[in-house]
Amino acid sequence: MKLASGFLVLWLSLGGGLAQSDTSPDTEESYSDWGLRHLRGSFESVNSYFDSFLELLGGKNGVCQYRCRYGKAPMPRPGYKPQEPNGCGSYFLGLKVPESMDLGIPAMTKCCNQLDVCYDTCGANKYRCDAKFRWCLHSICSDLKRSLGFVSKVEAACDSLVDTVFNTVWTLGCRPFMNSQRAACICAEEEKEEL
């Protein structure tokens, strides 16, 4: 009995017992191809949503680093012209930040511009970019302390503002970083695959 049921399963899996249809082999192949293409597209869409969600939370395993699909290092995109740095006003979680929220502190704008340039450099490390940004912001407080003398309330307020700005970028900056890296970099094997 086991042999008969095994034979039946094998026979059905090989296409036995199916009524012959009028479809040509080309039509069957295109249906099969469409099905596989559709499944692949569905998995890629789900993967894309998952990656976007991870970027929002800070990257895979908390590491926000742009990598090519097969582990190779990304290469600078030929002819890529980075956007002009836009200061501290920008997009926050995909929403345009009103210009009134930009504090208009020239030194802070300079720090934000440096961060934009760092993010737009192919192969950049987000955490190094963020560390330079933090150092730049804290240098504003140091300069303020030197010019005003020791004023503890002003110094504390400056440090608090700088830490808030830095922590926001550190925590929620993965998505802008990844978007900048996608624009600035190219993965050679992925380009070949799309052709």
Curated annotation (Swiss-Prot):
InterPro entries: PLA2G12, PLipase_A2_dom_sf. Keywords: Calcium, Metal-binding, Secreted, Signal. Its main location: secreted. GO terms for cellular component: extracellular region. GO terms for molecular function: calcium ion binding; phospholipase A2 activity. Its cofactor is Ca(2+). GO terms for biological process: arachidonate secretion; cholesterol homeostasis; lipid catabolic process; phospholipid metabolic process; triglyceride homeostasis. Binds 1 Ca(2+) ion per subunit. It comes from the Eukaryota. SUPFAM superfamilies: Phospholipase A2, PLA2. Belongs to the phospholipase A2 family. This is Group XIIB secretory phospholipase A2-like protein. It comes from Homo sapiens. The lineage of its organism: Eukaryota, Metazoa, Chordata, Craniata, Vertebrata.
